[in-house]
């Protein structure tokens, strides 16, 4: 895994015939942790680099009264009737999503739509999503953040909505915390959203103070090696460590 070149695009052939073209497409990269890593939730300074590997999401309004999320990587389609979609309780929505096949991965996409509709008072409409990702799953390179940022970017283009400053990564974090149920910090979403090719992104995680990107000297490269250890922010141990860090402030 190396630093990020141009982001990919992919065809929309897997979107259903009922979609109202044109749709919106957006991409976001994974990130390589160069310094700081898991200490983001304790307010530390971290250095992150965007990867070449990215996630691309295409979204389009459709006529069928449902949300549909197709993953080109697993070859599955998640569907949720609009009548079962509610934003008054993220926890209730999480249970509804997980009760359906594919809900474990589709929750990131549906969660982004939920927070955007709720926080920005947008009209809920039937949408079909198509997702393709090159970011390795469970390897600690922020595959979930890349999916969230790409989804929110696509939705903002679809709804013709502009989110200033760090609002987009904050909404992405809210989707992962509230709908997915993972107690992640904000670092991954910031890195995926604001990372610059061939640069390190310094972030002071208190919670989202961005410093100017640092260009890499010529000839210097960072390479990520797969340790074979699977990583999951949703794991119980992560939540326990984060809770312990907060207790240290009191």
Over which residues does each language-model region extend?
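Acidic-enriched catalytic cores of C-N bond-cleaving enzymes acting on peptides and small amides
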Residues: 183-187, 191-250
């Amino acid at each position: 895994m190396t630093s990020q070149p141009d982001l990919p695009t992919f065809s929309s052939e897997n979107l259903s015939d009922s979609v109202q073209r044109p749709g919106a497409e957006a991409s976001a990269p994974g990130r390589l942790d160069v310094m700081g890593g898991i200490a983001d939730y304790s307010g530390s300074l971290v250095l992150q680099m965007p990867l070449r590997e990215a996630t691309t999401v295409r979204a389009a309004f459709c006529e069928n009264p449902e949300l549909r999320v197709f993953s080109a990587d697993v070859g599955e389609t998640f569907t949720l009737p609009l009548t079962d979609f509610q934003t008054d309780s993220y926890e209730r929505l999480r249970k509804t999503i997980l009760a359906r096949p594919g809900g474990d991965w589709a929750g990131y996409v549906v969660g982004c739509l939920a927070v955007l509709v709720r926080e920005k008072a947008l009209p809920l409409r039937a949408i079909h999503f198509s997702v393709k990702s090159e970011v390795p799953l469970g390897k600690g390179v922020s595959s979930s953040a890349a999916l969230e940022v790409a989804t929110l970017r696509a939705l903002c283009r679809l709804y013709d909505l502009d989110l200033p400053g760090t609002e987009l990564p904050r909404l992405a974090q809210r989707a992962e915390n509230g709908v997915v149920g993972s107690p992640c910090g904000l670092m991954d979403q910031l890195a995926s959203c604001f990372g610059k090719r061939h640069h390190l992104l310094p972030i002071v995680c208190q919670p989202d103070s961005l410093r100017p990107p640092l260009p890499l000297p010529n000839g210097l490269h960072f390479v990520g090696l797969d340790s074979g250890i699977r990583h999951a922010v949703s794991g119980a141990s992560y939540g326990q460590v984060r809770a312990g860090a907060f207790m240290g402030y009191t």
